C-alpha cells in the first residue's frame, strides 16, 4: 500500500510501528490509570519496552483501587503522585510529554498547567468543553512554544489522510457534501460509569457530554476536517442548525442531528444516537460531482460517478493506531512539520458542539415513543423506529424535523458560527426542557 508523503503527514508504513524516533528518549507523565487512561498506560508501557519512553510520573487519585497498576508503574520507574497539582510541581521542566485522558471539564485547566510546566501535551478528545477554552489552550501553547496534540485518533491514520488528499486533488470532482451517521446503543451502566456521563455541567464547569462530544466526536471532527480547503486545516464554519433530544433521564442529549454550513458552501450533516435497538457503526460519506468516498470502521473506499469502486484503503487496527499516534507526537517534539491534530483542527469540532447547544435546547422525547428492555442482564432504552427515522434523514440530507416522519422532532434555530468565540453567547441560554 502506498503511504502519504512524509512532508505532509509524516506517516510511517504499517510494518514500521514505533520505529526509533530522531528525538532522544522522551520523558513522559500520565494523568490517571483507570477508565480510558488505561489505554494510555498500555501505550506508554509499549513505548518503554521499545526504548522510546522514560516513564517519569503519574497521577493516581484512587491508588487503593488500582494496586496492580501501582505496582507495575513503580517497576517501570515512575513516581506516583496523589494529585495532579503535586505532579505538575514535581515534573516542571523535567518531561517532554504529558498525557491527559481525563473528564472533558478538566481538559483546559490541566492542559494549560502542563504547558506552563514546559511539557508538550497529548490530551484525549475533545480539546476542551468550550470554544473559549480551546482558544486559550492555543494561546498558551504558542506562548510557551509547546504543542498540544488532541486524541482524535482517526486523524492520525493514513487512510483518512488519503481520503482528504483525494478530495483536495479533485478525485471526486467538486465537493458537494460530507455527512456522518452512527447508532451505538448504550446501557444504564454506560451512564453510571463516572460522575459526569450524561451531564452538561459538573459543578460550575461545562461538561457538555453527548454522543457528538464523546463516542461520535471522532466522526464530527472528521467531517469538519475532510471539508477543509487545505490538508492541515478543517472547514471554516459559517452556521449550524441542530436538533438535540434525550430519551433517558439525563441532562445531555442522547440523540442529535445537525447541519453545518461551511463558508465555502459545503454542507456537513451529522446524525447520532445512543437509544437505538440496533447497532450501526458510524459511516462518513463525502459526495462530489464525479464520485464519492466512504469511510467505515474497517477502511475507506473511493467510488466513481457510476458507483464503481476504484480503490480501497484499510484502516489501522486499534493497537497499531495508538502506536501510530505515539510515533507522531514523539516525532513532533523535534520536527514541527509532523502532522498532529492540534487545537487549530480540534477547534472546529468544539465550535460545532457549542453551536449545536446554541441552536437547540435538549428536547425530551415523549415516553410513548420510548421502550425499556433488558438484554444479556443489562438495562437498555430505545426510541421506537429511530433506526429508520435517522437512516431516512441521512439518505435524504434532511434533519429529523424536515422529513415529516418523526412526530417528536423539533427544529432548532440557525446559529451563526463565523467569529464565534464564547459559549454560551447569551447568559440566558436554555439548555434543556
Go through the PLM ranges and name each one:
Residues 2-75, 430:
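N-terminal Rossmann-like dinucleotide-binding module
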Residues 10, 15, 207-208, 214-339, ...:
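Contiguous beta-strand/loop segments that form the cofactor/metal-binding neighborhood of enzyme cores
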Residues 36, 154-240, 246-249:
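Predominantly a Rossmann-like dinucleotide-binding segment in NAD(P)-dependent oxidoreductases
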Residues 78-140:
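Beta-loop-alpha module in the N-terminal Rossmann-like domain of NAD(P)-dependent dehydrogenases
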